[in-house]
């Protein structure tokens, strides 16, 4: 349990890359938290936007790897914003503050949706050079919770965390995925009620991405492939190309992970 949080890589990252806090709105309570690593001479960095449960440091492994190859990487944590236009306006101000005219955006889940909304928001004066979308979506209606979006601010923190945790895998997973889930649960615990409520509101508020406004932007789509979905209709790979031997190995790995205390 908690292997990632106590790992040498994570501790080295936290001790060498400073967490910056920046205010760009008139409301001083709206604070952007970010890690900015890599050569400052690069004016078109890769910016990571986290999911509902994520903080800026959930991307520490990507930051360490990419900066080692010479990239400039910025990982963000959002302030409390209650609608997509407010977020886009705040993010634009942040880029202006950082003196970044063009950026590459990587977004996971909610982060991927917000990345698309920002690209849409700036389509007349483009700020997004490319999009990398991991388990993202382009229409909030897929969650069937648009009718509850305006009530999240009323809910206590424990109830909001329960909603988010309901999306985490509860079945047997491979050890690396189990460590990742533990780490994300730990990061979730660090978020306050208003942070969670605002993120869930952005995640479920009735909205969609207008495709014609981002059609000229290169997009890379990443789909996470979990072992328990291997060979099923939920897999990222066509089940017809999965061999019986692979399925036997997968079943054995999951059985072992389930037996471990």
Curated annotation (Swiss-Prot):
It holds the Pfam family Abhydrolase_1. The modification Phosphoserine is found at residue 257. Its main location: cytoplasm. InterPro entries: AB_hydrolase_1 (IPR000073), AB_hydrolase_fold (IPR029058), Maspardin (IPR026151). One of its GO terms (biological process) is response to epidermal growth factor. The keyword Cytoplasm applies. It comes from the Eukaryota. GO terms for molecular function: CD4 receptor binding. GO terms for cellular component: cytosol; trans-Golgi network transport vesicle. Residues 87-159 form the AB hydrolase-1 domain. Interacts with CD4. Interacts with ALDH16A1. Belongs to the AB hydrolase superfamily. May play a role as a negative regulatory factor in CD4-dependent T-cell activation. This is Maspardin.
